[in-house]
From Swiss-Prot:
Protein name: Large ribosomal subunit protein bL33
Molecular function GO terms recorded: structural constituent of ribosome
Superkingdom per UniProt: Bacteria
NCBIfam families recorded: PRK00504.1, PRK00595.1, rpmG_bact
Keywords attached to this entry: Ribonucleoprotein, Ribosomal protein
Keyword Transcription regulation tagged: no
Pfam families per the UniProt record, alphabetical: Ribosomal_L33
Family: Belongs to the bacterial ribosomal protein bL33 family.
Gene Ontology cellular-component annotations: cytoplasm; ribonucleoprotein complex; ribosome
Length: 64
């Protein structure tokens, strides 16, 4: 039997300033994984979270 797909999906959030910022504490890009409800949040998610590479709170956008 095929499993029914749930409403919640796992997404990846990526720091928007790590790609362009060169004055970082350490090299790399900050990524968080979380889940979202497909029915309630249909668009791309944007959350302000702490980036350890930039050493500040930045906007993290959904990439996949």
């Amino acid at each position: 039997m095929a499993a029914k797909k749930g409403v919640r999906i796992i997404i990846t959030l990526e720091c928007t300033e790590c790609r362009t910022n060169t004055d970082k504490r350490s090299p790399g890009v900050s990524r968080y994984t979380t889940s979202k409800n497909r029915r309630n949040t249909t668009g791309r998610m944007e959350i302000k979270k702490f980036c350890p590479h930039c050493n500040t709170h930045t906007i993290h956008k959904e990439i996949k």
